[in-house]
Amino acid sequence: VALFTIQNEFHYEIVRKIFEGGMGIVFEAEQHGARNFVKRVAIKIIRPHFASQKMFIDNFIGEAKLVADLIHTNIVQTYHLGESKGVYFICMELINGVNLEQFTRQLAEKNRQLPKELAVFITSRVCRGLAYAHAKTDREGRPLGIVHRDISFKNIMIAFEGDVKVTDFGIAKARGFLTDQEGEVVAGKADYMSPEQADFQVTDKRSDLFSTGVVLAHLLLGRNIFKGETPEESRRRILNMEIPDFRKLDSRIDTPLNDLLHRCLARDPDQRYATADQLLYDLEYYIYHSGYGPTNETLGKFTR
């Protein structure tokens, strides 16, 4: 019913379902305009059993309003928030590619290993998007205090052209935009969340940097060291597991990269990178300090 309403009132033609997450469903669609104008977009709606719950609706609207002003090459763009007969949807940039979960699964099926430099490159592009979001201010110049809170394989896209995009700010927190229940509920995916999230504490931008470190380690090792049999076990590992010497897990990982990972994954936020810009600098220095390094074209060629 929701899709029928959207198609008829807003000139979208739904092509196929792309992704189904915990709270939302994303479809590929065509937006039609005058004189046979057609633009391929993505349409996100709330899952039906959440669509009547005020908290989910408020967060959905808050996500759209927040991301509408995040204009950055490493963040999926939002074009429009629509509503008809109580049904809300977000029209977004369509990425011709895969998320990291799909990407690494395809590599495993083909028995291919992601080159170390590309793992670091992908992570550096995530950091570029986060650095921009973390520094975002309102129109009066006041910091919004954005924290994504759900940096994970499912929420990082790789376009076949080689662009890396952060998506799904659905549980992000930001001043004045989204419902914030920190200290009451656990937000984020259990095997990527920071110790602060796992322990029901208040988060800041350094929480996203821990999750980014988990992503980098996962890309390098081909597995998530914190993933347990249950979400509860994953949270226990994040809170208590000794962070390994990554050099012993993969011979490609040298001391500088091992040190970088340990700084990202420090349980004490004060021992982590203070900003995404700092982490970005170290990531890019690692892959470019000796000269030429990976580019979007390099990643796109590898992905295709």
Residue ranges of model-derived segments:
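AlphaC helix of the eukaryotic protein kinase fold
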Residues: 47-69
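Protein kinase catalytic-loop region centered on the HRD/HxD motif
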Residues: 128-146
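Activation-segment/catalytic-loop signature of the eukaryotic protein kinase fold
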Residues: 81
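Conserved short submotifs of the Hanks-type protein kinase catalytic core
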Residues: 85-99, 103
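Protein kinase glycine-rich loop
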Residues: 15-22, 26
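C-terminal lobe helix-coil module of Hanks-type protein kinase domains
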Residues: 157, 191-301
